[in-house]
């Protein structure tokens, strides 16, 4: 197996276009663009589909998913109530693949998910002026950060994205 020194997997970069409703803390992700360098691609459509899946899963993790704990351990034990993103909340996803057939294949795998949370956090900073360093970036956390900055928010306990 060929492996270049210092390069163990494919490279990916995200650009996120989102809006934040300051009063509610609600986030609407409009578009995500992902560029990926996987080296030689045997099946470019398969790589594109893999990246779409990575984006959807990463978006759900960054905005909604969490495991709650109490003194006894894990408190989130009911899968039916576990928050995940729905199809209606998915943004437009554009995938840009680098055509580098002269390079060895580096795989697609989960590499497109690596920059996801950071890209979303940076888009939130651009939209709100507040830094968010701990996902999930829930409406409650958005409202708390905005209130700390003196922005008027409503006090809802939970607001769904979209």
Where are these regions (language model features)?
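C-terminal catalytic domains of large/alpha subunits in multi-subunit enzymes
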Residues: 3-162
